Amino acid sequence: MAWEHLRVTDTPTWPSILGRLTTGQNLGTGQAAWAMDQIMTGTATPAQIAGFAVAMKLKRPTSAEVTELADVMLKHARRIPTDIIGNETVDIVGTGGDGANTVNLSTMAAIVVAAAGVPVMKHGNRAASSLSGGADTLEALGVRIDLGPEQVAASVAEVGIGFAFANQFHPSYKHASAVRRELGVPTVFNLLGPLTNPARPRAGLIGCAWAELAEVMAGVFASRNSSVLVVHGDDGLDELTTTTTSTIWRVQAGTVERLTFDPAAFGFQRAHLSELVGGDAEYNAAEVRAVLGGAKGAVRDAVVLNAAGALVAHAGLSSDAKWVPAWEAGLARATETIDSGAAEKLLARWVRFTQKL
């Protein structure tokens, strides 16, 4: 129905927007942006926010709608200055919400990638559904997570990695986050964290817990000229998994290509999900120290795989990156970075640097 996609010229209202969503119609250009602006400025009521969040998820959001939501959220965010660090940094983050309560694979992978010499600009938060999110675990390791924009940029410039704690950088999101917590079910807002990194890095390994929405996220990154791998473990993880295959939406030069990825092709043994399960922040911090200290096993394998994925995404910023050679190089670099002690040293340097600020 072509008329559904016509530009809507009427001034948006909540009844008109919720009316479209609850009858399964896509929003007109600018309507999602209007709704998000109402939410971010505190104008929308909790009932309007909840209705919008749930109805949008049930309709299934389009990439155009989610792009508008993310762009408005970034407009209200505290920006990280990129004049020193540029935007050819990489983020490693997932939507969360996979219910698996794994150890913090993306946090460990981020440290490995930074130690391999690729600047990491990580966006993250405390746990929503698991016992310990990336922010909780970094705090337990001694990394200060409450840094402001200039301090985070300095951390990337000096150490090679910075962490943007979502609460610090998206103060206007507080209206939505309270509603999101009360609802307790995934909504369209779950997609926004990985799409609203305040430093706008151009590369990323982005996990999505919902296969049907991963392609929507990939479409947003494609519109930004990013080099990103949006990944969904076929066991449901919002990471590249080692228990089975993963589906990858490879975003490069404005296009999206869907691939099935089998780590066994690169020599990885199949793991059991139980081997990747984490605990509270102290438990997960101990797991980080063990893996960076050289401990072998399923967690290390998953960390190496995800670190390599981020290195592949970053390599994709140059147009001549070939898929299989990039993976082989990424896996070798990630392994060497752990085995040489470089990743362990980088974490110690990061802790020292942030504690001095």
Curated annotation (Swiss-Prot):
Gene Ontology MF terms in the entry: anthranilate phosphoribosyltransferase activity; magnesium ion binding
Catalytic class of the enzyme: transferase
Binding, Mg(2+) 2: D238, E239
GO biological process assignments: L-tryptophan biosynthetic process
EC number(s) recorded for this UniProt protein: 2.4.2.18
Reaction catalysed by this enzyme: N-(5-phospho-beta-D-ribosyl)anthranilate + diphosphate = 5-phospho-alpha-D-ribose 1-diphosphate + anthranilate
Positions contributing to Mg(2+) 1 binding: S106, E239
Name assigned to this protein: Anthranilate phosphoribosyltransferase
Naturally occurring in which organism (per UniProt): Mycobacterium sp. (strain KMS)
Gene that specifies this protein: trpD
